[in-house]
Amino acid sequence: MKEILAKLVEGKDLTKEEAMKAQELILTGQATEAQIACFLTALRMKGETLDEITGLAAVLRNKANTISPKVADYVDFVGTGGDCTYSFNISTTSAFVVAAAGLPVAKHGNRSISSKSGAGDVLEALGVNISADPAVVEKCVETVGIGFMFAPHFNPAMKYVGPVRKQLGIRTVFNILGPLSNPSRARAMLVGVYSPALTEVIAGTMMNLGVERGMVVSGEDNMDEITLTGETTVSEIKDGKVTTYTITPEQFGLKRCEIAKLLGGDGAVNAQITRDILSGKEQGPKRESVLLNAGAALYIGKKADSIADGIALAAKTIDSGAAVRTLEAMVQATNA
């Protein structure tokens, strides 16, 4: 580990093999907390490469507990967190809409590390048992249409990294690696990242890991979602290649808004926002943000021919009551 750290602090890139070796040392408890902190900080300051992220993600995936839902197609839907915008849980809320529209979701996430409320926090506040066994999660995906894979249970080796990440309190490569380690091995993914500079390298890593259809998105406000506040950079995986472009809310008939309109709070506050959106009570920018992100996921999962068609399907799904019923079904299934 010392040799790898020496290379990083000089600003030199690691090979894929060196990254894999470092990750093996970290996830087996052979690296000290000081070494892990140095590794994460030096890598962040240098900037992570495609080879480094691929190597780190491959080892993390190999150590994960997995599920294999018996459904034809399913999607993972996740943000990296660490965007420091303190928005409500857009991707988590959107996941219920996507599932209710008929596209199963195998969602992987954690409690908050570098934000006010992670997916685990809001789902727990909604009444979901986030500590459900893998068999229960798998059945949830198959019967309810959505399951939540709580990172500490599905990536137990992360226990060596968690305390260091919490103490550092800054974005690290593990914000990126979490979504890439999806224990369901989803072939379709919508991943939000906190910097437009990361979309292509993350899309390339996803292709290296077997993702066939996907989008990596980052708002110009550094939101790790498709944003309503301005342009979003999109790197789309389709037909074995990555295409990068930008989209705006206006393209889809949605109104641009200030980031303040999308703010949330802790798990309890965000849970109420999620309920209000799924029940149809919330009709403002928060709802439109969910429609936009759910629409993109439905497009990626081939439930819609375009993002615009996906948005229309998402709106219809909420208005029919199906989205809030899916939330209620998940709560019941995970607590049975």
Mark where each language-model region is.
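Acidic, glycine/proline-rich low-complexity segments that act as flexible tails and inter-domain linkers
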Residues: M1-S87, A101, V105, R256-L262, ...
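Short, conserved micro-motifs enriched in small and acidic residues
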Residues: E33, T85-T92, I113, G284-S289
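Short amphipathic alpha-helical face segments that pack within enzyme cores
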Residues: C38, T93-V97, S289, N293-A296
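Acidic, glycine-rich active-site loops and adjacent beta-strand->loop/helix elements
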Residues: G79-C84, G109-S115, F154, E220-D221
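Glycine-rich anion-binding loops and their surrounding alpha/beta cores
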Residues: K7, N62-N65, S87, G102, ...
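A glycine-rich phosphate/pyrophosphate-binding beta-strand-loop-alpha-helix module
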Residues: L40, F88-V144
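Gly/Ser/Thr-rich beta-alpha loop segments that engage phosphate groups in nucleotides
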Residues: D13, D83-C84, R111, G120, ...
